[in-house]
Amino acid sequence: RASVKQVLNVDKRTPSVLAIARSDRLKDSDRHPHEIANNTDFASLLSGERSSWFCNDIDNYPHYKSTSVSRGYKSTIVWPVLTRVAAEDLMGTFAEDGAGYKPIVAFLCLDSAVPGIFNEEQHVPLGWAVSDALARLYEAQRSFWEPDISIESSK
């Protein structure tokens, strides 16, 4: 499965994500924001600890956290969608990368119910190409990606 999760940073203290696109049907749990701090993959990307998240066996990853009620996946790859536009022009949140801040506006997520399904050397670079294309689309059509405020405020 593939999904795009928009970063919401309404109050700057509790950044969260909201699923805005999925390869399968959106579930009810996708219709409300999930705090980034409670999701190991998003938190590690936002903190700059990793540039992408790759895990072929989530069940055996120590202290893995996810706010997805019924996760249903065993393997996952997550890429940040990074834009090149000025930070003040973007909705989103920012991760320290050592040389300044990088705007993370969304996450591209790929997961599978099968453990060990992904090949890091092949799939991670391919995902970066898709993530970069999403970032260019986001820069060009920001309003297309803006979440429905009624969904966000019903939290």
Task: Please state what every model-predicted region is.
Residues 1-4, 130:
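Amphipathic alpha-helical coiled-coil segments that mediate homodimerization
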Residues 3-77:
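Regulatory sensory and allosteric helical modules in signal-transduction proteins
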Residues 7, 80-81, 110-112:
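Short loop/turn segments at strand-loop or loop-helix junctions that form parts
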Residues 13-15, 87, 119-121:
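Generic domain-boundary/flexible-linker signal
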Residues 31-35, 67-70, 91-92, 119-125, ...:
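Surface-exposed beta-strand edges and their flanking turn/coil or helix-capping segments
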Residues 63-103:
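Helix-to-coil/beta transition segments that act as allosteric "coupling" elements at the rims
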